[in-house]
Amino acid sequence: MNLKRLFTTEGVKGKKDYLDSQKKYEIIRTVIFFGISIALFVAGFVTTGDRNNLLTIVAVLGCLPASKSMVGAIMYCRQSSLAKEDADKIESHTKDLTCLYDMVFTTREKIYPVLHMAVCGNNIAGYMPMKKAPKNPKKALSENACAEHLDTCLKVDNYKDVTIKIFTDLGKYITRLSQLQELTTEDKHTEGICNTLKSIAL
């Protein structure tokens, strides 16, 4: 177990199976945080015989980061990594492309699980699989809305004129990957764009 992952996802975000592996760290951290608060409350009550003491205040304040951690754990538990069979199909078409896995982007209204992305200069392609059609059409994930959200975030970091295409169909996504492999484009923005994408992802 990498204890560093209890407090940071640096170096692992964007890697294959990131979402599935990070879940346990989020849950463990949440349990530890709540455990500390409970231990402080019990210690204060045992030593003073009364719950109205300084340690109770500290325990209550400790529930704030614990609750925040719990929200994060719930977010991770609701997501899953890219299916192995899909990953195998995709990886046969990503030679020389810079790729990111398990990128979940959030807005106030939507959650966009883009489980694979390829970045080639100022070109981005992403695969957002549709598990099943929602009962309410308004809750359906929109490839265009996701692309617009990412474009807005990239412009904040001065990455303009970026072509972003998000696909819910695996076949069309693989076709786009093949097209990206044939592009002759400057690679100078790839690393910076990847860093921005990772910074705004779950």
Please annotate each region the language model reported.
Residues 95-133:
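Acidic, Ser/Thr-rich low-complexity segments on the non-lumenal side of membrane proteins
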Residues 1-100, 107, 144, 148-155, ...:
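Surface-exposed interaction regions that form or flank ligand-binding interfaces
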Residues 132-150:
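Mg2+/Mn2+-dependent nuclease catalytic core
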